[in-house]
Amino acid sequence: MQQGRPHANSSIVNGKNKNLILGSFVRNLSIRVTEFSPYLCSGFKNKTKMRPYIICHMMASLDGRIDCEMTEQIDDTNHYYEALTQLGCPSTLEGKTTLAMHYAQDGVFQQQRPHEDAGQQLYKAVEAASYAIGVDTRGTLLWDDNTTEIFGRPLLMILSERASQEYLDYLKSKHISYITAGCNGIDLPSAMETLRAVFNVERLAVVGGGNINGSMLDLGLIDEVSMMYGYGIDGRGGMAAAFDGRPMDRKPVRLTFKSVEEQDGIIWARYQVNK
């Protein structure tokens, strides 16, 4: 639900250290740690277990659907973005589908070399007060040279350790920061710890789509839900909901009401997630 295409500079510092902890990482860091066999598929280890405070902030129709073309028709104002500013979350996180729809180039990354798993790595291309964070499990999105920022915030991609080394080299050539965590999909808890410890992300807004929202909720990573309901109903079958993809055996996630307000016919409701 965001746009913008300036660009960022970067610099690189290489390093390897088998006793490495996140608190000792320095700025502009590029590290490969596949030799850490105990940690190979569990992400970088942060002894403090700290992560950002995470708010899921969404605009939806009254029936909870979030298709962007639809929501733009039921809120043609800036209420969504004004509310996001009020939440005090300068960094945002979006799923691959949303990124592909709004920001990435058409097509997918084509490997030219035999596949080599990236393993655990991170690359900090630029020091910034906030980041536009994206999830791309296997590393397939293509980026224009001028799209290293979204809304003036540098891109930071989260991938699995099964992403190819060639793709990470591609991101680095674009001066795009990245984190790899997890072998069987992305280890989101570990990635969130890295965001806090290395990239200094203290408050994070998850802004869709439904699958990344659902995954974060299912893992207990959402602290607060901020829902804005536009004055319309979608009603079309098969359209994404604000939270999608949780296993069928899961129980509902209980919430505690925080506040509600009306803004020109739009309802903004906030809830704390019960832990």
Question: Which role fits each region the language model picked out?
Answer:
Residues L20-L22, L29, L40:
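Short hydrophobic targeting helices and cationic amphipathic motifs
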Residues G43-K275:
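Enzymes that bind and transform nitrogen-containing heteroaromatic metabolites
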Residues A8, G15-K18, V26:
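Short hydrophobic alpha-helical segments enriched in small aliphatic residues
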Residues R32-V33, G43:
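Short Gly/Ser/Thr- and charged-rich N-terminal loops/segments
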Residues Q3, F36:
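Cationic, low-complexity basic patches in intrinsically disordered or flexible, solvent-exposed regions
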